[in-house]
Regions:
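Mature-chain termini and adjacent capping regions
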Residues: 1-232
Length: 232
């Protein structure tokens, strides 16, 4: 542990400012690097970080967080928080009710209720999200009920989401319902939302049931370009 400023008070945890903490595996190879403006060393040896925290994994993956408390558990080789987490992505901000991470992993688990707010408008609500940035990937996965909301539609999925943010592809799993602002509904399965090039295209290769005032259509697959209002 390195810090620019060190405060030690009787019967209180050691306070560190501008801290850099490094963890090592059994062969003394560097695992994680954690950086924060402020941290405390508890009597147990655990280190509690406050505020902005940057975590760099063994393979160089960067996780940027803001939280009231995040604890480096020295005995279990885990990082954990039971406070609200704000996770900063490149084009999105994610909030959750806590987080867990093993020191030798590139995957972070954001637990409880999770909200992903994309910079260009859509909001995704789900639970218990896995964030995987290994080998340059940017994968978000959840098996919980997921709701995607944009300006024109609200999409609900019963079996979760598998999102590849590098490719701007969101896969909503299982039974899916699309509710349009006009009141129209589309029921299908395993929906892909393609956000590439600033667009919003809904695709499904499963059975589709479209309903609107005076309209009832069933089809074997669907392609819906939302910005141009073209459904085929």
């Amino acid at each position: 542990i390195e810090a620019e400023t060190y405060f030690s008070y009787k019967d209180s945890p050691v306070l560190l400012l501008e801290i850099v903490a490094k963890t090592y595996d059994k062969s003394q190879q560097e695992n994680l690097v954690l950086k924060s403006n402020r941290a405390k060393i508890m009597k147990s040896g655990d280190v509690v970080f406050n505020g902005d925290v940057n975590i760099v994994t063994k393979s160089g993956v960067l996780h940027q967080l803001d939280t009231e408390e995040l604890t480096l558990l020295t005995e279990s080789n885990q990082i954990k928080s039971e406070s609200e987490i704000t996770y900063l992505g490149i084009n999105e901000k994610i909030t959750s009710q806590g987080m867990e991470m093993n020191q030798d992993s590139d995957t972070m688990y954001l637990n409880g209720e999770v909200k992903i707010k994309q910079d260009f408008g859509p909001i995704i609500k789900t639970t218990n999200l896995f964030v995987n940035h290994y080998d340059g990937n940017k994968i978000y996965q959840s098996k919980g009920r997921t709701v995607y909301s944009s300006e024109d539609n609200t999409v609900s999925s019963e079996q979760g989401i598998d999102a590849d943010m590098n490719k701007d592809l969101l896969n909503l799993l299982g039974k899916v319902n699309i509710l349009g602002v006009s009141g129209s509904t589309i029921d299908s399965f395993n929906l892909t939302i393609d956000q590439s090039n600033g667009g919003e295209v809904f695709k499904s290769n499963d059975l589709v049931h479209y309903q609107a005032t005076g309209v009832n259509i069933k089809a074997k697959k669907m392609y819906y370009d939302v910005p141009v209002k073209k459904l085929s």
